[in-house]
Amino acid sequence: MPRSLKKGPFIDFKLEKRILDLNAKDEKKVVKTWSRSSMISPDFVGHTIAVHNGKTHVPVYVSDNMVGHKLGEFAPTRTFRGHAGGKAEKGGSAPRKK
């Protein structure tokens, strides 16, 4: 169920303040955050935000298409190592009929 419109989007106060301070100074620094649930606002565009994935901080460069999404969507928390079982042989199947 989506968040109520009357509440507005959630953006971590400290994160928003740091981004607005950088915008006022025209600086581009990497900003570390643990707030994966913060919504990306138009003020964040052009900045690199290091989002914590549970182990490390993953640098995420914010572009125009990311506005409205959450920071955690761009920092995966799980590593896919492949399915169990032996490796499939290359070209081991029967030839296809046309």
UniProtKB/Swiss-Prot annotation:
Species of origin reads Chlorobium limicola (strain DSM 245 / NBRC 103803 / 6330)
Which NCBIfam families did the record assign? rpsS_bact
Q: Show the segment(s) annotated as Disordered.
A: 77-98
**Alphabetized UniProt keyword annotations:** Ribonucleoprotein, Ribosomal protein, RNA-binding, rRNA-binding
Give the GO cellular component terms, alphabetically.
cytoplasm; small ribosomal subunit
Q: Which family does it belong to?
A: Belongs to the universal ribosomal protein uS19 family.
InterPro entries per the record?
Ribosomal_uS19, Ribosomal_uS19_bac-type, Ribosomal_uS19_CS, Ribosomal_uS19_SF
Chain's role: Protein S19 forms a complex with S13 that binds strongly to the 16S ribosomal RNA.
Q: Name one GO biological process term.
A: ribosomal small subunit assembly
What would you give as a GO molecular function for this chain, any one?
A: rRNA binding
**Any coiled-coil ranges, and where?**
none
SUPFAM superfamilies in the record = Ribosomal protein S19 (SSF54570)
Kindly provide the name given to this protein in its UniProt entry. Small ribosomal subunit protein uS19
